């Protein structure tokens, strides 16, 4: 299955191969140089590469790791109490790394009781296991858990945006060439700018649309744009009839993406 899904097939396996600002990349290279992985909280927008970096760090250090998705509310608590606890409490015989690693993806989707349980696990298994949490909104992580982690924010600012977008554009061209998919370069640029820095969404959209054999302007009409400024303007003016129209017209968009766009516009 991973050979079919582009996001998995072309997922970077090393920190060097990850598309990130140099300042962020240096942080993880320093961890590689010391051979140590601290408990970490990786915060930033969806699709920017938080989980990819966590996996790449483990791969390069040869650390055994176990991934749990915090969005799986139904089974998450049982998975943490059983599978994760068993993983964290045993010593790896096949790895030379100092610690095992548990990656909690989308940790901001977990409840307070789960986060307090994870805090207890950090202390209980400190000698054998490290925890890496990823989140879109770090303010949703409780202070007792937050304070036990080194926080790395995946923020891309100012001039870095153009540089990082250009690197992803080249990576996207490479992937499309490998997959033998024709593409209009101007369309790719517009697509990247539209969803920056959500690389996962760009790649998923390209793969979905590539079934026709070519990526052209049609992909830009395949999903609706989100005019967040219109929403904020109407809210400030208390024009609630227009707000309702905006909500209805954006029902098909992902909730997390909408919230992120609004959050970024406010801050």
Task: Tell me the role of every PLM-derived stretch.
Residues 1-160, 167, 207:
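P-loop/Walker A NTP-binding region and its immediately flanking N-terminal helices
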Residues 166-267:
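AAA+ P-loop NTPase domains with strong preference for DNA replication initiators
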